[in-house]
Amino acid sequence: MNAIIVTGGDIDISLLENYIAENKEDVIISVDAAITKLEKINVIPNIMVGDFDTLSDGEKLKKYENLNVEIVKHDPIKDFSDSELAVDRAVKDDIKNIAVFGALGKRFDHAFANILILQKYKKIGVDITIYDKYNKIYVKSNHFILEREKLWGKYISFFSLEGKNFMEKLEGVKYPIENKIIYNIATPSLYISNEIKDDKLEAKFSGDLLVVESRD
């Protein structure tokens, strides 16, 4: 079982609508005021999570309760973001694959925390992918293959999440890598804006890397 989490950041509505249409069996979790985004495309979530401090209309919660939507309400004073609590709710149902929309909004603190959440859950076997109009962001461990026709846009970039990672090989790309260290401090931008030139890329490396597929 997979899940789609919709948070309160910037969302390309048509992108979200198309993704939901293509993944009709996925559990849909709305975070706080993101329900207003789902209402624009006439989608009723399975679960609503949050402190609902940004949802001023109390009648809206009652409406969805009457539609048998599970409401998970948290205290506004808490140690976790609403987005992280939504992921926890999905994991509670043993969901291992989660797509997140709206994670990259106006506030960088929330966006950065959402990116760090990817690695936290990767460590327990949960794959989370953040989508927006221009980016697809996820964490990979040790090895992966990506076909060029499945690339989100034109570019692919890699960032260390562990201070440094050893890249044994990155092949099938415009700028191949062999037996090099990826440092997140000394060379933070060295491995950005690569391109797949063959039918697929293959990467072998140590630990976890943040992978960003992007387009202009």
Residue ranges with predicted function:
Residues 67-75, 125-129, 154-162:
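A glycine-rich helix N-cap at a beta->alpha junction
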Residues 71-93:
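Short phosphate-binding loop-to-helix
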